[in-house]
Each structure stands twice: as C-alpha cells, then as structure tokens.
Amino acid sequence: MLTHDTIERNQGLMIVLILLVIAIGGLVEIVPLPFMKSMTEPVAGLEPYTPLQLTGRDVYIREGCYGCHSQMVRPFRAEVERYGRYSVAGEFVYDHPFQWGSKRTGPDLHRVGGRYSDEWHRLHLVNPRNLVPESNMPGYPWLAKAAANAEDIETKMRALRLVGVPYKDQQIAEARGELKDRTEMDALIAYLQVLGTAIKQKQ
C-alpha cells in the first residue's frame, strides 16, 4: 500500500500522481462545458448588435475603453447591489471577442444600458467632469464630429455570421443605410445603451 512517505520519497511516482489528479480535475471541469446549454445558447431576448451598435462596439475597442471598464458583473452581493443582476454566459454568445475586461479604473458597464439618457452619455463623453467632477476619464469630443464608418460594415456582419451570429441577408444589405449621417458618438452611445438589457433587471 502506498503511504504518503513513500510517494514523497519517489519523485517519479509523485509526478505521475500529480499529473493524474490534474487530468481528472481538467476532465471534470472542462469536458462538460460544451454540453451545457446555459454556456452555449443565448439568453431569451438576446439580439445581435444592430449595425450602429456594432460600429459603436468597434469605437469602444479602438479607444481602449476596456482598459478601464469591465463588462462583467460578478455574482457577489456588493457588485449586484451596485451594478445590477450578475452577468451570465448566455449574454455574451454574440460577442466576438467578449469585453469582460479585468481592470476597473472606472465602473463596470455591463448593466449601463438604459440607466442614463442618450444626452447624459453625450455630455459625459465630451467631458466627463461636467457630470462627475472627480472622474479621471478622458473626454472624447472628436467622436461627435467623426462620421460612423460604413465602409466595411457588411464585411464585419458576414464575418460574424460565420461564427454563429444570426444576421439575415436583409439586415446586412440595409446596414450602410442605418449608418448614414450618424457619428461615432451616436454609434458608441447606441452600443452603451444596449449593454446588459437582454435580461430584465430587478432594481
């Protein structure tokens, strides 16, 4: 019979047993994930981003907003009380790549959709200190003058369709029209206003 002392004295045996434990742990934790519907299917009510929201998401990524804002409310009481219902995997099925983030210089944004008006976001993006005096977020006034980029929107939507986002041909065909005469600020606000709205929240 193997004793603890025997295992510690035999390095080869100890390595084999460590690898065996890691392998079993990996199988138990990882293998079931693809078969769990809650991890792979969208939550009820989740819609793909509209062309305007998708363009706003690109602006969000380009400007590095993920460096200071996360988009994942963790299942802790303090977070739920501050931000709203905790995030679930089915809300991110159409996010390629997801924007969970790992740093919060600013607040989490996953439940910001519908919390403030479009005008509030517009004022905040131009100069955050107009609304939150202690904010260290930079302003983004140029977004109000930059036209929303419609050049490659159809290509983006087709690429997303290849990875499972259910865009229809008609949506792709009408995408440029939705971006006509819209600014990057319009697009970013549209994106922020849809974040976390697929699941109804109890406030």
Residues covered by each model-derived region:
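Electron-transfer interface patches adjacent to heme c in soluble/periplasmic c-type cytochromes
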Residues: 14-24, 81-185
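Electrostatic cytochrome c docking/interface patches
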Residues: 37-61, 73-80, 105, 175-178, ...
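Sequence context of c-type cytochrome heme-c attachment sites
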Residues: 32-46, 51-54, 70, 86-99
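Surface-exposed patches in mature extracellular/periplasmic domains of secreted proteins
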Residues: 68, 134-139, 199-203
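The canonical Cys-X-X-Cys-His
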Residues: 56, 62-71, 121, 188-192
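A generic secondary-structure signal for well-formed alpha-helical elements
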Residues: 31-38, 63-67, 72, 76, ...
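Charged, low-complexity, helix/coiled-coil-prone segments
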Residues: 1-12, 62-72, 96-106
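Post-cleavage N-terminal segment of exported redox proteins
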Residues: 1-49, 163-168, 189-203
